[in-house]
Amino acid sequence: MSLRHFLTLSDLTKQELENLIKRASELRHMQHAGEIYQPFVGRTLGMIFEKSSTRTRISFETGMGQFGGSAIFLSPNDTQLGRGEPIEDSARVISSMVDIIMIRTFGHEKVETFAKYSSVPIINALTDEFHPCQLLADMQTYYEHRGSIENKIVTWVGDGNNMCASYMQAANQFGFELRVAAPYGFEPDPELMKRFSHCVSIVENVQEAAKDSHLIVTDVWASMGQESEQNTRARRFSSYQVTPSLLDKADSEVVFMHCLPAHRGEEISHDMLDDPRSVVWDEAENRLHAQKALMEFLLKDKIKI
């Protein structure tokens, strides 16, 4: 297989994504059964973080260790990237010493440039524009709880942010209808709306957006780097809180997801994570298994079976 990167969901075909989700579920069962599977012995993952994270670091580092490989954590203080070295130079050097690289940063153009000059696969672990790894975990979680998401209705509640953008791509790739309930001025990127208008719609009324939905998803009102907007956003999003009563408007088989960390009392009610329809803890764990499946896919020509 030629060099492949995972910068957005659109980098994989529908069939590849569906196979990856099923493989992630298999890996979860293998891990829970105590099965040892180490195809990455002697392989190294480079982890470049310009944005901090709990779940991203733990899931990638643990996953690489479970696969028998090793992971190197690189913060801006640990690399010349933080001192102004051109991205293309860092990409050439770092990729010559590791087997695969994940990057969690701000501008999406950084991971695109890194991928252009890298000799190994690049994984987008989050940018301001997209969060594709989280969508792999979300799709795996829905698959495990409810089966195929094709032809289902998904409701996104809140900011049209990077998570929302990746859900728009997922709607196209996995074949579901996405309703976005966002206040005026916080809708998704117009270009993305135009591209995915066949499967994505804006429904400003939250109650209407939730009607008959099979999956309801939300995220924080102010993402990392938007802390100065917190008070303004809290006012604008006050009627966009996800609660058990909102889920009552949805399909009887609805499930709720949140990529975490969650702010109880803001985008969700204090009791939402504990509602029996919430699958957020499985969703969080599945970051580990989905990313293991992704790394296995990207390095499948080099692994030991």
Swiss-Prot record:
Q: Name one GO biological process term.
A: L-arginine biosynthetic process
Q: What are the record keywords, sorted?
A: Amino-acid biosynthesis, Arginine biosynthesis, Cytoplasm, Transferase
- Broad class of enzyme this protein falls into: transferase
Q: Name one GO cellular component term.
A: cytoplasm
Give, as in the UniProt entry, the pathway in which the protein acts: Amino-acid biosynthesis; L-arginine biosynthesis; L-arginine from L-ornithine and carbamoyl phosphate: step 1/3
Q: Which residues bind carbamoyl phosphate?
A: 53-56, 80, 104, 131-134, 259-260, 287
Q: Name one GO molecular function term.
A: ornithine carbamoyltransferase activity
Q: What's the main place this protein lives?
A: cytoplasm
Q: What is the lineage of its organism?
A: Bacteria, Pseudomonadati, Pseudomonadota, Gammaproteobacteria, Moraxellales
Reactions mediated catalytically: carbamoyl phosphate + L-ornithine = L-citrulline + phosphate + H(+)
EC number(s) stated in the UniProt entry for this protein: 2.1.3.3
Protein name per its UniProtKB record: Ornithine carbamoyltransferase
For binding L-ornithine, which residues are annotated in this chain's numbering? 162, 219, 223-224
